[in-house]
Amino acid sequence: MNKSRVVVGMSGGVDSSVAALLLKQQGYDVIGLFMKNWEDDDTDEYCSSRKDFLDAASVADILDIPLEAVNFSAEYRERVFSLFLAEYQAGRTPNPDVLCNSEIKFKAFLDHALALGADWIATGHYAQVHEINGQFQLLKGEDGNKDQSYFLYRLNQQQLSRTIFPIGHLYKREVRKIAHKHGLPNSTKKDSTGICFIGERPFREFLNRYLPVDPGEIHTLDGQIVGEHQGLMYYTIGQRQGLGIGGIREGSEQPWFVSGKDMQTNVLYVVQGHDHPALLRSSLTAADLSWISGAPPHQSWVYAAKIRYRQTDAPCAIIRLEHDSCQIGFAAPQWGVTPGQSVVIYESKVCLGGGIITDSV
């Protein structure tokens, strides 16, 4: 029997529940831990943390494992949410899930688990950890449609050395099948979507409570005024919905897309047509780099990159590499490259790391 102690982050969802189940079957001393990362407006209408905790508790009872609830909302506000607001205020579109993983789920949670005497932590992420000669690699999850390595690229060697991903080798359908077979009550529970602290709440309504609104003009690239925006923070590159632009006399009937923002003049730029050249970029610049091995990848080697979750891998090369910034060139132009989002670099199934997109050409 393997009596190593592992603390499993249990969200109330099927993935983390099956992760706990598998570890228990493998003989680990399993402790469940439910993380509460957000306090404000935790109402039934928009946020389901109370229901999620009850689901996690129900599974813990069935598995006969202890479940602890811990509140990381102060850490979340300081390390994740404050940066989220600052990025939006600067006109960028951040991905808080990336920071939540590196700062909360694999830092605050890991520290707490170690204080409980844990040897390992585990989560229900679709990813895998391999150790080769004392180096820990982060690999894509086996289920390509659910792979979550994109959100985990900021993890370091110390974090990965303590991490188990029990369902990383499984497909989602297999996870649900295991949950159903063992009578877990959340076997058919819907996957959570959206940003964790916003829940199902309308995004503009949420952001408007924290940042001042500054409406302005919407321009075409040749300077024609075609509408008014509600505040640059509400829009992201490539956005089509919610622009409120009607038909232009003698103009094209193709849909409008956001192509850029000018924070100095408070102008939102739009173009018509999904394949407009202004929406395509052949290279990007990234900063705040994080490399899983601790060392940067080779310049000029052919790698693959994702500039958004679930994107098909795009062949690329690192054409300039400095201490904390790099330029990445693509074999084919990429659509909707968005400042504030993460670019993540892969070598086959191995996630090497990445950075935050700052610019593109």
From Swiss-Prot:
Residues with site note (Interaction with tRNA): H125, Q341
GO term, biological process aspect, one: tRNA wobble position uridine thiolation
Residues that bind ATP: G9, M10, S11, G12, G13, V14, D15, S16, M35, G124
InterPro entries found in the cross-reference section: MnmA-like, MnmA-like_C, MnmA-like_central, MnmA-like_central_sf, Rossmann-like_a/b/a_fold
Primary enzyme class: transferase
SUPFAM superfamilies: Adenine nucleotide alpha hydrolases-like (SSF52402)
Disulphide bridges, residue numbers: C100-C196
GO MF entry, a single one: tRNA-uridine 2-sulfurtransferase activity
EC assignment: 2.8.1.13
Subcellular location: Cytoplasm
UniProt keyword list: ATP-binding, Cytoplasm, Disulfide bond, Nucleotide-binding, RNA-binding, Transferase, tRNA processing, tRNA-binding
Region feature Interaction with tRNA, mapped onto this chain: 146-148, 308-309
Active site positions: C100, C196
Catalytic activity: S-sulfanyl-L-cysteinyl-[protein] + uridine(34) in tRNA + AH2 + ATP = 2-thiouridine(34) in tRNA + L-cysteinyl-[protein] + A + AMP + diphosphate + H(+)
GO cellular component, one term: cytoplasm
Role played: Catalyzes the 2-thiolation of uridine at the wobble position (U34) of tRNA, leading to the formation of s(2)U34.
Recorded family membership: Belongs to the MnmA/TRMU family.
HAMAP family named in the record: tRNA_thiouridyl_MnmA
Protein name: tRNA-specific 2-thiouridylase MnmA
Organism of provenance: Nitrosomonas eutropha (strain DSM 101675 / C91 / Nm57)
Protein's gene: mnmA
